[in-house]
């Protein structure tokens, strides 16, 4: 009798808790950046602005994208899924150059800077002779 009672109590509890846990994270789809076709961009990201001239002499061209919660609250969290996708595409993070919200990546002889905020991110292609 006790076995049936325990099974009656535990079985719904186990089913309820397993139904409330998240399954595998939804796979993100990627397109390409408008400033460099080798830079993957989440397809859900909306291009806001392209900057062709900058007061910063190190920046060749830049683009700003909007994507809900890419950087978490106040942009404090690193979007590891996106950075893993960059790595898969051949971009190597220059960890020693990281500056707060800004991470640098290199592929062949091109360096990009990615600045992460809560709901936006900026990508800047750096000039060949950039000092950063």
Q: What are the language-model segments listed below?
A:
Residues 50-132:
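Extracytoplasmic electrostatic interaction patches
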Residues 15-19:
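C-terminal motif of bacterial Sec signal peptides marking the signal peptidase cleavage site
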Residues 1-5:
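Positively charged n-region of N-terminal signal peptides that target proteins for export
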Residues 23-70:
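Compositionally biased P/S/T/G-rich terminal and signal peptide-adjacent segments
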Residues 6-13:
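Sec-dependent N-terminal signal peptides
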């Amino acid at each position: 009798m006790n076995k049936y009672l325990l099974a009656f109590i535990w079985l719904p509890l186990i089913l309820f808790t397993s139904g409330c846990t998240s399954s595998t994270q939804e796979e993100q789809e990627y397109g390409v950046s408008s400033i460099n076709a080798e830079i993957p961009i989440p397809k859900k990201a909306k291009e806001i602005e392209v900057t062709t001239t900058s007061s910063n002499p190190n920046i060749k061209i830049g683009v700003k994208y909007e994507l809900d919660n890419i950087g978490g609250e106040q942009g404090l969290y690193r979007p590891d899924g996106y950075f893993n996708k960059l790595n898969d595409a051949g971009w190597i993070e220059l960890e020693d150059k990281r500056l707060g919200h800004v991470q640098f990546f290199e592929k062949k002889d091109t360096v990009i800077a990615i600045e992460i905020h809560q709901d936006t991110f900026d990508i800047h292609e750096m000039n060949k002779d950039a000092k950063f």
